Amino acid sequence: MATIFDILNTLNNNNFENCKRQCSTNKSNKTIIDILPPMDVTITNDKLIIETELAGISKDQIEIDIKDSILTIQGERKDLNKQHNNNNNNNNNNNNLVIEKSTSTSSTFR
């Protein structure tokens, strides 16, 4: 079983690793942003409690997996950014442009 120092060391190493690969491209050429949100880790006699806030991601969009002693917490949220392009020559002609961007969150612990 991992000690608290192993977990904290993994969290620390993951922060640096995520900085190196913060923006990558997957097979479908979509940009994926890996984010390691702040976490509170509490160890009791019989539990390891990890608390984190995943802003903009609902419970049904979060996947939690434990495989080969590796905990993975993963989720995806879609943000809609509305940009308004105002035509200075004609104020009645406003073009609205909606840009959808997908953000993926994934954290893995051994």
UniProtKB/Swiss-Prot annotation:
PROSITE patterns: SHSP
SUPFAM superfamilies linked to this entry: HSP20-like chaperones
InterPro entries reported in the protein's UniProt record: A-crystallin/Hsp20_dom, HSP20-like_chaperone, HspG1-11-like
The protein's name in its UniProt record: Small heat shock protein hspG11
Feature: compositional bias, Polar residues: 101-110
Source superkingdom: Eukaryota
Pfam families from the UniProt entry: HSP20 (PF00011)
Keywords of this entry: Stress response
Region named Disordered: 78-110
Domain named sHSP: residues: 30-110
Homology family: Belongs to the small heat shock protein (HSP20) family.
PANTHER family: HEAT SHOCK PROTEIN DDB_G0288861-RELATED
Biased amino acid composition, Low complexity: 85-96
